[in-house]
């Protein structure tokens, strides 16, 4: 069942990516047609590395903070205001192409065409001959600072994303180009191990063994004086490479401990957990900040790889800090009264609050609303808390009694009965702390099965599974317990289904007949039926009816007759009728 859920998530993200590609396919086609010297797929690869092939506008940004990353625009992710750090490649593309900056920002076709024209001009100037030469042009048109050798990692990371996209067969099929066979080792040399690492690299410099260590400068973080007791979930509103580069900008005065790449979940650590990163205002002192490569209203950035990588990281953090319990991960996206806690700002308390792993939007004195409504908190909670013991019950009938429950509970029960049965859960009592303690029931053998419901303020009453397995999951917060709940469960074989009621065909039947014949004209209209002998004499009165009727023929002598039927006054259908 879990594999099914993950497959559905992957399928959904693939569909959204395909929709994005199809939506802007014409923009890329026109650009390649105008500038055939640009290798097929390269424009899409650059766009995907920067924007996941989404046309970014101001509507994709929420943060107005001065220290937020510079905004990128259009399919190609061009920066207008680099805030004195990023290169302003929107202006350069405009100058090279002759297109106005406002048109490049507003129109996806112009955005790609302007970039392609600028790329072609630079290619001619550089006398591009090899693919490596093309990558140098990509660098020239990037917003990322060129930097000294020690600061090359963000640029290399962006170029790696471009090249790995081109080598990816599934991306090639989706975006309509022949997959490349680039030798990444030849292109990136010894840097390839770090650029391609997911969870295989052991980096002794980082707190988290699977993370790449690429430190932010000391100007962008401070000394921690308070104990760590929380985790803040962010999204970048920019690319992975761009975020890493931005945290190296002393003027930004911003950083996070970790940054996670959307495509494969790669983790880069930039500030040691023992130090105070600057990511959540007053919560900096006691929290660890994790940035996820995403825009809050572009759902396909939130990949399965990124969720899993982030959950693995948080689980590792929980193992090292007694003050952070995975059960205290935020998951209450919507309350029974309709309040959505994953949209807008919701102060869930400060350092002593129950919820220890939550979004930027959930801490006091904040202006950011990340990670926003597309972040699946309930799924994230399940990933962080994988390994919870499961109580398995078998048989045809029994009781579940979970009264007087405790704090910080996560309990899971799986009930399985004999095949060809359905399980009914009948709750005789149900009393949970409003808005904080919850019961889920799933139609299958684990918490990834289809959800039958979630309950908090109202009793489930009777809940019936579709098969012979049902799963219950209960969670409580860190304080205030109510009476709990009890239910009786019983497995029963469902009653055999009623035979389907088939629509009778248009016509006359039975035929031959002895008592009655059924006449059906197939629609609810005024109709008539008349019966004649072979000499043309009407032997029964004309019967008028709506749609269908029965005619008593028991009084007719045995023999052959002719029956006329159809819409009133027309009776266009004629059938031989045999009376026994």
Where are these regions (language model features)?
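C-terminal outer-membrane/trafficking sorting elements
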Residues: 1-6, 16, 502-509, 513-580
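N-terminal export signals and maturation junctions of secreted/periplasmic proteins
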Residues: 4-9, 13-34, 188-206
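Catalytic glycan-binding domains that act on GlcNAc-containing polysaccharides
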Residues: 22-168, 174-175
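Extracellular/periplasmic catalytic domains that process cell-envelope and extracellular macromolecules
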Residues: 37-39, 68-71, 132, 222-227, ...
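Active-site-proximal beta-strand/loop segments in catalytic clefts of secreted hydrolases
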Residues: 47-51, 79-81, 233-238, 260-263, ...
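Basic/polar, cationic surfaces and motifs that engage anionic cell-wall
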Residues: 158-212, 225, 299-389
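N-terminal catalytic cores of peptidoglycan-degrading enzymes
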Residues: 179-281
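Domain-level representation of secreted and single-pass membrane ectodomains enriched
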Residues: 389-499, 514
């Amino acid at each position: 069942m879990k594999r099914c859920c993950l497959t559905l998530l992957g399928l959904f993200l693939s569909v959204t990516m395909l929709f994005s590609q199809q939506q802007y396919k014409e923009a890329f086609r026109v650009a390649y047609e105008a500038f055939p010297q640009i290798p097929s797929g390269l424009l899409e690869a650059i766009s995907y590395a920067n924007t996941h092939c989404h046309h970014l506008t101001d509507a994709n940004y929420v943060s107005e903070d001065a220290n937020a990353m510079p905004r990128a625009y259009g399919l190609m992710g061009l920066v207008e205001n680099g805030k004195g750090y990023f290169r302003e490649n929107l202006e350069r593309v405009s100058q090279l192409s002759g297109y106005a900056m406002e048109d490049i920002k507003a129109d996806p076709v112009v955005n790609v065409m302007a970039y392609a024209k600028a790329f072609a001009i630079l290619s001619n100037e550089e006398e591009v001959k090899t693919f490596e030469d093309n990558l140098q042009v990509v660098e020239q048109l990037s917003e990322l600072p060129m930097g000294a050798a020690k600061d090359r990692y963000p640029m290399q990371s962006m170029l790696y994303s471009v090249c790995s996209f081109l080598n990816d067969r599934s991306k090639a099929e989706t975006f309509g180009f022949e997959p490349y066979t680039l030798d990444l080792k030849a292109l990136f040399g010894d840097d390839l191990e770090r650029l391609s690492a997911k969870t295989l690299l052991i980096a002794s410099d980082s707190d988290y063994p699977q993370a790449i260590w690429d430190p932010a400068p000391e100007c962008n973080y401070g000394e921690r004086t308070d104990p760590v007791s929380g985790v803040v979930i962010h999204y970048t509103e920019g690319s992975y490479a761009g975020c890493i580069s931005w945290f190296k900008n002393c003027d930004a005065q911003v950083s996070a401990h970790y940054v996670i790449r959307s495509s494969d979940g790669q983790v880069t650590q930039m500030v040691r957990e023992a130090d105070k990163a600057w990511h959540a205002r007053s919560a900096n002192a006691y929290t660890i900040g994790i940035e996820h490569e995403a825009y809050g209203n572009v759902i396909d950035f939130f990949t399965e790889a990124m969720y899993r990588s982030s959950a693995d990281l948080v689980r590792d953090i929980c193992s090292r800090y007694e003050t952070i319990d995975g059960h205290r991960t935020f998951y209450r996206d919507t309350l029974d009264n309709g309040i959505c806690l994953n949209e807008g700002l919701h102060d869930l308390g400060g350092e002593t609050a129950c919820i220890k792993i939550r979004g930027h939007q959930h801490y006091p004195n904040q202006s950011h609303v990340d990670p926003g409504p597309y972040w699946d908190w309930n799924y994230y909670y399940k990933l962080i808390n994988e390994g919870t013991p499961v109580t398995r019950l078998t048989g045809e009938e029994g009781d579940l009694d979970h009264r007087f429950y405790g704090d910080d509970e996560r309990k899971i029960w799986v009930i399985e009965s004999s095949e060809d049965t359905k399980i009914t859960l009948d709750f005789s009592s149900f009393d949970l702390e409003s808005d904080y303690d919850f019961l889920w029931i799933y139609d299958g053998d684990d918490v990834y099965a289809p959800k039958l419901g979630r309950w908090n303020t109202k009793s489930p009453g009777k809940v019936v599974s579709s098969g012979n397995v049902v799963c219950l999951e209960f969670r409580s917060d860190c304080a205030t317990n109510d009476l709990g709940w009890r239910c009786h469960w019983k497995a029963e074989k469902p009653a055999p289904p009623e035979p389907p009621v088939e629509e009778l065909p248009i016509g006359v039947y039975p035929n031959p007949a002895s008592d009655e014949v059924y006449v059906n004209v197939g629609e609810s209209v005024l109709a008539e039926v008349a019966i004649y002998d072979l000499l043309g004499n009407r032997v029964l009165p004309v019967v008028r009816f709506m749609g269908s009727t029965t005619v008593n023929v028991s009084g007719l002598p045995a023999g052959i007759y002719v029956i006329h039927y159809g819409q009133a006054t027309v009776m266009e259908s004629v059938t031989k009728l045999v009376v026994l």
